């Protein structure tokens, strides 16, 4: 079952589907809090059902290639992510009409809508950060844009997400031997170039010509058909970790949802 409803309803419908014995693919973000994400993950495991969060980033061929070539950059020192996309609904929001994507009652906002891709990108490569800080532009209780900082033991990751403005997408992983540059948003995960400080540049684009959601749904189908619960469990762990970063970040910025305890 594929669940694509406003963010605040993801948990309700996912829980109901799992209780009914259905495998579930739920749109990102899986849940508005880490506790609720953990609840869904444990429910799926207890019933031996597949539960996947539909976040395209981590299933793209280029993302797998980034993980493969990452050691070439040397010791990672900085990571930059920018997913800024002016929303067609922002004008309505400014005029007082609120769509779910800009409604705190629906668990909306730039972080939950776009930032989730950046966080998934970073956490999927490096695991959970040690510290999180979110400086957001907030209007009527919701973030229309913001800058998220994730601190790791030996490097910092910065994520910009915006629905009130646009900019070119940039994903850069900087290291002591070179850097990886990607000029597309994390949901597409387009071509990547490795720029070594010594030697020739290397470019790869393994996802060219494929629909954006093709890789993830092929992965879901293969996992279910082959009963690959190990993959499902591993991806659920990542989804819970991403949910924890998102929750910590928005709480840090003073953004509250109805599901918060």
What are these regions (language model features)?
Residues 58-130:
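Predominantly a Rossmann-like dinucleotide-binding segment in NAD(P)-dependent oxidoreductases
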Residues 2, 219-261:
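C-terminal helix-rich "cap/oligomerization" subdomain common to oxidoreductases
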């Amino acid at each position: 079952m594929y669940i694509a409803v406003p963010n605040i309803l993801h948990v309700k419908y996912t829980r109901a589907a799992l209780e009914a014995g259905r495998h579930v693919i739920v749109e990102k973000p899986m849940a508005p809090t880490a506790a609720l994400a953990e609840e869904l993950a444990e429910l799926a495991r207890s019933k031996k059902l597949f539960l996947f969060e539909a976040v395209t980033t981590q299933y793209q061929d280029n993302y797998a290639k980034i993980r493969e070539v990452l050691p070439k950059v040397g010791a990672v020192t900085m990571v930059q992510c920018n997913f800024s996309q002016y929303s067609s609904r922002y004008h309505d929001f400014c005029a007082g009409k609120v769509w779910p994507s800009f409604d705190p009652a629906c668990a909306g906002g730039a972080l939950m809508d776009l930032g989730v891709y950046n966080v998934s990108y970073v956490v999927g490569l490096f695991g959970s950060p040690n510290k999180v800080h979110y400086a957001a532009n907030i209007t009527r209780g919701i973030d229309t844009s913001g800058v998220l900082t994730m601190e790791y033991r030996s490097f910092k990751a910065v994520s910009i997400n915006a629905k009130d403005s646009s900019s070119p997408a940039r994903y850069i992983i900087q290291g002591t031997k070179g850097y990886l540059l990607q000029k597309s948003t994390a949901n597409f995960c387009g071509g990547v170039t490795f720029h070594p400080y010594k030697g020739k540049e290397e470019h790869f684009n393994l996802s060219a010509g494929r629909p954006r959601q093709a890789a993830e749904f092929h992965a879901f189908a293969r996992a279910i058909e082959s009963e690959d619960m190990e993959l499902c469990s591993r991806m659920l762990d990542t989804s819970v970790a991403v949910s924890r970063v998102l929750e910590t970040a928005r709480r840090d910025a003073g953004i509250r949802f109805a599901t918060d305890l």
